[in-house]
Regions:
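Periplasmic-binding protein-like
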Residues: 138-142, 155-157, 184-193, 214-218, 223-225, 295-316, ...
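Short, polar/charged alpha-helical segment
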Residues: 42-53, 57-59, 63-83, 160, ...
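Bacterial N-terminal signal peptides
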Residues: 10-21
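A bilobed periplasmic-binding-protein/Venus flytrap-type ligand-binding module shared by bacterial periplasmic
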Residues: 159-166, 202-204, 272-287, 303
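A ligand-binding cleft/hinge motif common to bilobed small-molecule-binding domains
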Residues: 118-121, 241-260
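Extracellular/periplasmic bilobal clamshell ligand-binding domains
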Residues: 318-351
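Extracytoplasmic ligand-binding site segments that recognize negatively charged/polar headgroups
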Residues: 59-73, 85-102, 106-239
Length: 351
């Protein structure tokens, strides 16, 4: 689902660029809230809070799970006395709603929070604004886009998840190539459209090594399961012994709930940023910036870590802090989506 959507999104953006269709903001050279969002004076925080409280509310569109979004919203409201109006959908729904409203010149949303590639697509459509936050200093330099129109607030890691009743941790290989051993045949499951993970591995290893691995993996005929959540449920139930390219967040949260699941950072660990940004025409820019600051702060980052999410901030310790990983670039994911999906379908789906 995610890979197919990413290919569709990439094609739509390419077509828009080719024929000059945009959200209608490209002709505006200056961002309307630039003075607010880029202010770095010593009174920044005091002034921002005063103005945000005058605005009273902030509208947030996110794909963060309700069980994780709700406590963060409650913490923000309790701290600042500002009401959060939250709309939640799948990542594609968030993008579609933002673009539809922008093209209709209906400026309702202040803050957008979803997957990195989707955030990058919104930046290309010029519906986001560059902004500054003092919490940028807590982020790894390689995760911050040069345009700074969106900033990573959490990281998703592709790992190996396994059922602890059927697989011993010490039996998990240290690299993905170890799963080519015939003893794993019939025990491996993959998400049905995980071409993004495949592209990250191939780009890390190089064409020769990466292509050879996925060709040989496809010959083992791994089980394909549609959706990362379903994939993790099957691992927990014992229907799948191991899942390659599983989402760390799904494995960690399942483990926290007492499921017989654990995860291993098998090399190469591919990381993908999830991001937050401020709408170019945000009706409440001060509240938008205050909420974005909060999401990047140690308080909210610590909450994400406690819920099994990978915090983007280096100021917060979590069980992903010591991971050695390769950061995928959302711009590359968008540009290469079609290529990797075609290869995935050829290898694993016989298309």
């Amino acid at each position: 689902m995610q890979a197919t959507w990413m290919r569709t999104l990439a094609r739509v953006l390419l077509l828009s660029a080719a024929i000059g269709i945009t959200t209608g903001v490209s002709a505006q050279s200056a961002e309307p809230h630039q003075a607010i969002l880029m202010y770095k004076g010593v009174d920044r925080d005091k002034r921002l809070l005063e103005k945000a409280r005058q605005e009273g509310t902030v509208s947030v569109y996110t794909s963060l799970a309700p069980t994780e979004a709700k406590p963060i919203v409650e913490a923000f409201e309790a701290k600042y006395g500002i009401k959060v109006e939250m709309w939640r959908g799948q990542s594609e729904g968030v993008v579609q709603r933002v673009l539809s409203e922008a093209r209709g010149k209906r400026h309702a949303v202040d803050v957008i929070e979803t997957n990195g590639p989707e955030m990058e697509s919104l930046a290309r459509e010029q519906v986001l604004s560059e902004f500054h936050s003092p919490y940028f200093a807590d982020l790894p330099a390689d995760v911050i886009p040069k345009h700074r129109q969106w900033i990573p607030d959490r990281l998703n890691f592709y790992v190996v998840a396994y059922n602890t009743r059927k697989v011993r941790r010490e039996d998990i290989p240290t690299t993905y190539e170890g799963f080519l051993d015939p003893k794993w045949k019939g025990r491996i499951s993959l998400e049905a459209n995980d071409s993004e993970w495949m592209g990250g591995v191939i780009n890390t290893w190089g064409q020769a090594r990466g292509m050879d691995f996925f060709r040989r993996l496809s010959e083992l005929k791994p089980e394909l399961r549609k959706g990362h959540i379903l994939l993790m449920q099957l691992v927990a139930s014992g229907e799948a012994d191991v899942a390659l390219g599983a989402y760390y967040a799904n494995a960690a949260s399942t483990k926290q709930r007492g499921g017989p699941v654990d995860w291993v950072p098998v090399e190469p660990v591919i990381a993908r940023p999830q991001g937050i940004g401020i709408a170019r025409n945000a009706p409440r820019p001060h509240a938008a910036l205050l909420f974005t600051d909060f999401m990047l702060s140690p308080q909210a980052q610590g909450m994400l870590a406690s819920m099994g999410r990978g915090p983007a901030s280096k100021a917060v310790k979590s069980d992903t802090t010591a991971l050695k990983y390769v950061m995928s670039q959302p711009s590359v994911i968008l540009d290469e989506a079609d290529k990797w999906l075609q290869l995935w379908e050829k290898l694993f789906m016989g298309k």
